[in-house]
UniProtKB/Swiss-Prot annotation:
The keyword Phosphoprotein does not apply. The keyword Transit peptide does not apply. InterPro entries: Ribosomal_uS2 (IPR001865), Ribosomal_uS2_arc (IPR023454), Ribosomal_uS2_CS (IPR018130), Ribosomal_uS2_euk/arc (IPR005707), Ribosomal_uS2_flav_dom_sf (IPR023591). It comes from the Archaea. One of its GO terms (molecular function) is structural constituent of ribosome. This is Small ribosomal subunit protein uS2. GO terms for biological process: translation. GO terms for cellular component: small ribosomal subunit. The lineage of its organism: Archaea, Methanobacteriati, Methanobacteriota, Stenosarchaea group, Methanomicrobia. Keywords: Ribonucleoprotein, Ribosomal protein. It holds the Pfam family Ribosomal_S2.
Length: 202
């Protein structure tokens, strides 16, 4: 998809429309959930749903501001999705959060007897489907959840939705980079990091 297929303007965007499109942030799936309909820009001829990057841009700002209210050490970043693992860890390391990358051990938030038992104040996940276990546990212990949500995701268990392609390598790198940059800005820091610093090697 090129720029003229999404002729929109962003209000004080974090990056340009072209950069969002180049990263594939807008590319959804061929399924649309009722929860995500307000974040969808259009459906392509091949049946692929396209996310509205105006919503993505605003929700990244919202999520970063929300997360910046917390002590970074009390933010838990969880992802089992392959292309989410490197950027999620880089995000966690950059802001001082705690990452759980790969397999999530059930009971981490609910069973104090586990060696890796955690008591975060907020949880960030890459995909509400593959990271469902931690979301369920967060609800049990009343911890808010920030989630990267694609067109097919249900969001009823999520407190802050960031609409994005949550499967693509470049898209996840861009989203976690922008969350990092905005989070640090709210904390009073600048960063020299770039989206490429968050990109998983092929």
């Amino acid at each position: 998809m090129n720029g003229n297929e999404m002729e929109i303007e962003l209000n004080e965007p974090l990056v340009s429309v072209e950069e969002y499109l180049a990263a594939g942030v807008h590319i959804g799936t061929q399924q649309k959930s009722s929860d995500m309909k307000n974040f969808i820009y259009r459906v392509r001829g091949d049946g692929l749903y396209i996310l509205d990057i105006r919503e993505t841009d605003e929700r990244i700002k919202l999520a970063a501001k929300f997360l910046s209210q917390y002590d970074p050490a009390k933010i838990l970043v969880v992802t089992s999705r392959q292309y989410g693992q490197y950027p999620a860890r880089r995000f966690a390391d950059s802001i001082g959060a705690t990452p759980i990358i790969g397999r999530y051990i059930p009971g981490t938030l609910t069973n104090p007897l586990l060696p890796r038992y955690a008591e975060p104040d907020v949880v960030v996940v890459t995909d509400p489907v593959s990271d469902l276990q931690v979301i369920r546990e967060a609800i049990q212990v009343s911890i808010p959840v920030v989630a990267l949500c694609d067109t097919n995701n249900m969001t009823s268990l999520v407190d802050v939705v960031v609409p994005t392609n949550n499967k693509g390598r470049k898209a996840l790198s861009m989203i976690y980079f922008l969350l990092t940059k905005e989070f640090l800005r709210h904390k009073g820091y600048n960063t020299s990091l770039t989206p490429e610093d968050f990109e998983t090697e092929m």
